């Protein structure tokens, strides 16, 4: 037998916020299709609603929801705009990935700004060189969905 736990108030609130965005996302779908990118306004609404911090640790201003709730949010957003739901899924999972890094790395990213957005590419072909004052990273990346919003 499989039992499901009750949703937290934060999870319920995030799901409600996602539902409230659906009409606005739907209204921009044609523009997103025409421009071949998610409108900046849509990403700002995701951010303003706290949805991009759904998987972010509470210690850094996130909601630390379970993956099931994260995917429920994504499914709701898809009712408004599939492209926005895709971007949400890609951008929204990065806080979960960063949460697996050492705490020092998390502090470096979220220490002063809990709203910092993260992007990455899953197929990097790069070279890292130590230079005076830090590192130089050069390489080629075919794409990184959502990177223009980070």
Task: Please provide the spans of the model-predicted regions.
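Alpha-helical interface subdomain recognition
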Residues: 2-56, 62-72
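Glycine-rich flavin
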Residues: 40-48, 52-150
